[in-house]
Amino acid sequence: MKAAVLTLAVLFLTGSQARHFWQQDEPPQSPWDRVKDLATVYVDVLKDSGRDYVSQFEGSALGKQLNLKLLDNWDSVTSTFSKLREQLGPVTQEFWDNLEKETEGLRQEMSKDLEEVKAKVQPYLDDFQKKWQEEMELYRQKVEPLRAELQEGARQKLHELQEKLSPLGEEMRDRARAHVDALRTHLAPYSDELRQRLAARLEALKENGGARLAEYHAKATEHLSTLSEKAKPALEDLRQGLLPVLESFKVSFLSALEEYTKKLNTQ
């Protein structure tokens, strides 16, 4: 659990640098870009699936009876939300840029720590990969004669072949487990070192009289306040855009309810 928390903290603090710890061939992508891409995909999926649900409802017996015409207003609603997203895009981009700028120093320090630990750990990872490949090749060599025997033998030899393969599989499992345990033993000190470095960085922030933490908090609060103020016009546009849709829905619903009530009274 501690290792998982440490990993998440490092990924957050180092931003795109931590991502390239393992993936050097991909172009850098800022945290805001990743959040924006995820939000865009989510909204698009929600929009498409929502339209399908509305279409299914209007095609049902109840939907036809109520005749709310939700599908007619769906494009208007999605267009309004798309407009809101476009208006808020630059505002939220500015907020994220400011936040990244304020934490640049801390992220650079953590990135440096991560690179140093990576350099120390890399030989053990390379050695583990080499041994793993050797074990796989050894296993393949041991299994190859049995595979040939299976091709040449009859069905009655299948059980005999399975008995021969079982010890090989157990041996492979035990040897792999030994390599994993050895790798875990080698990496443990460096995991502790990285955790201690992170703790030291955070402790240093506290020991500075809390000045840097207070500064981060104050600037984040300021940026959030600015974001809220700049978002007000866009949210007001959203409210104005939804009013006709809500009013149309209200009229259709009341009309359907009145018609249904009349039918009940005539029965």
From Swiss-Prot:
What does the record say mutating residue 27 to H does?
In Munster-3C
Tell me what happens on changing residue 92 to I.
Confirmed at protein level
PTM Methionine sulfoxide: list the residues.
110, 136
Q: Name one GO biological process term.
A: cholesterol transport
Region annotation 10 X approximate tandem repeats: residue ranges?
Answer: 68-267
Q: What is its main location?
A: secreted
Write out the coiled-coil annotation as residue ranges: none
Gene3D superfamilies membership: 1.20.5.20, 6.10.140.380, Apolipoprotein
One GO cellular component assignment for this chain's record is:
cytosol
Q: Which UniProt keywords apply?
A: Amyloid, Amyloidosis, Atherosclerosis, Cholesterol metabolism, Disease variant, Glycation, Glycoprotein, HDL, Lipid metabolism, Lipid transport, Lipoprotein, Neuropathy, Oxidation, Palmitate, Phosphoprotein, Repeat, Secreted, Signal, Steroid metabolism, Sterol metabolism, Transport
Work out whether the entry's keyword set contains Mitochondrion.
no
Q: What is the effect of changing residue 199 to P?
A: In AMYLD3; uncertain significance
Q: Which PANTHER family match?
A: APOLIPOPROTEIN, APOLIPOPROTEIN A-I
Describe its assembly. Homodimer. Interacts with NAXE and CLU. Component of a sperm activating protein complex (SPAP), consisting of APOA1, an immunoglobulin heavy chain, an immunoglobulin light chain and albumin. Interacts with NDRG1. Interacts with SCGB3A2. Interacts with NAXE and YJEFN3.
Please tell me the disease that this Swiss-Prot or TrEMBL record associates with the protein: Hypoalphalipoproteinemia, primary, 2: An autosomal recessive disorder of lipoprotein metabolism, biochemically characterized by severe apoA-I deficiency and severely reduced serum high-density lipoprotein cholesterol (HDL-C). Affected individuals have undetectable serum levels of apoA-I, and develop xanthomas and corneal opacities. The disease is generally associated with atherosclerosis and markedly increased cardiovascular risk. Hypoalphalipoproteinemia, primary, 2, intermediate: An autosomal dominant disorder of lipoprotein metabolism, biochemically characterized by partial apoA-I deficiency and reduced serum high-density lipoprotein cholesterol (HDL-C). Affected individuals have half the normal plasma apoA-I and HDL-C levels, and may develop xanthomas and corneal opacities. Most patients do not have increased cardiovascular risk.
* Protein name (record): Apolipoprotein A-I
Q: Which organism is it from?
A: Homo sapiens
